[in-house]
Amino acid sequence: MQVEILATGDELLTGQVVDTNSPWLMDRLWDLGLMVRRKTLVADDRDDLRAAILETTGRADLVVMSGGMGPTEDDLTSECVAAVLGVPLERHEPSIELLRERFRKFGRTLTPNNEKQAWFPRGAEVIPNRWGSAPGFTVQVGRGRVVCLPGVPVEYRGLCDEWVLPHVRARLGEVPAAGLVKLFAVPESHADHAMRPVMDDAANAGVRFGYRAHWPEVHVKWTVPGPDAAARAARIRERVLGIFGEQVFGEGKDELPDLVVARLAARGERVALGESCTGGMVAELLTSVAGASAVLDLGVVAYANAAKEQVLGVPAALLAAHGAVSEPVARALAEGARRTAGAAWGVGITGIAGPSGGTPEKPVGTVHLAVAGPSGTEAVARAYRGDRDRVRRQAAYEALNLLRLALR
């Protein structure tokens, strides 16, 4: 099955909005053994939209189109699909009633421009939208079937999960087995080099491999077709885990903060944080996880030296001798947070996020991290590259990964 994505909206081409829908759908389709062949972005222009619909449906078996389904003048999807088909738009009464009910619920009156969301090309199948006001629709255009969905991410993804992906699975019949491991701080090129023997062995078996780099994470994915797909995918998984060992922090939908919270909860232990350059980012990552209250005792942003001394008990002499950005101070922050909270674990982070403040001895990007636990304190030094936000984010994730390793 040939699949293409067509996204419409001036905002996507002016940089005002980043298209997150397409990568999300590509990822889901990959798990079904399908790679999207092309993605097309088109402005809110009738001629360009009609041309793009004709072009994509002339090449692909399935075109998933997003955007242009709303009530405003620049929402043109239904109109342009109808024009390509040479059919009129028709009013869909069930959708009108749902719109009226939705507006009544919010104490508003349905206006003519909002009724526009319930007009579809003759012959189209309407796809109800329980996440928003604009339904989707699908219709055959030439050799390809086009599925038109609203561009709002929660609506787009809900409709894909509920309608698009099940229909794709039904058309495919046999779905390949898929695997995904997530690596921490492994460059994509290194991962690819390490995976070469596995990929070479599977080269003639229809197995697809792919990588996604979202530093400091790199994801390695594979899909395996055939009647014994599950067993072969499992063997690939075992080889991948053997190659990367502790650099693998998760699989599938695992996220690093979730794993750390789960490990702490399983042990009945708690953690306290002494953050400086990350400004509470580690606490933010942990508290984004439901159930974090069971494992997080304390989070202190000790930015000034006085705060390090007074709140977490970092000795003034230590700060004077080594400077705030140093391994001894990172250790003292971790141990001070642990001691102050009476927690099993403490994390300390101190560094220079930039863009200023660096020296030849301690350039921007220098970060010291420490984890204090029942068996002592471990510390590492890192030299991160990137802007201020990237340095801070890398340090926060590194701290979680160090804690993950300590909890193994």
Curated annotation (Swiss-Prot):
Protein name in the entry: CinA-like protein
InterPro entries associated with the record: CinA, CinA-like_C, CinA_C, Competence-induced_CinA, MoaB/Mog-like_dom_sf, MoaB/Mog_dom
Segments passing through the bilayer: none
Annotated HAMAP family: CinA_B
Signal peptide boundaries: none
Matching Pfam families: CinA, MoCF_biosynth
Family in the record: Belongs to the CinA family.
Alphabetical list of SMART domains matching this protein: MoCF_biosynth
Source organism per UniProt: Anaeromyxobacter dehalogenans (strain 2CP-C)
Domain of life: Bacteria
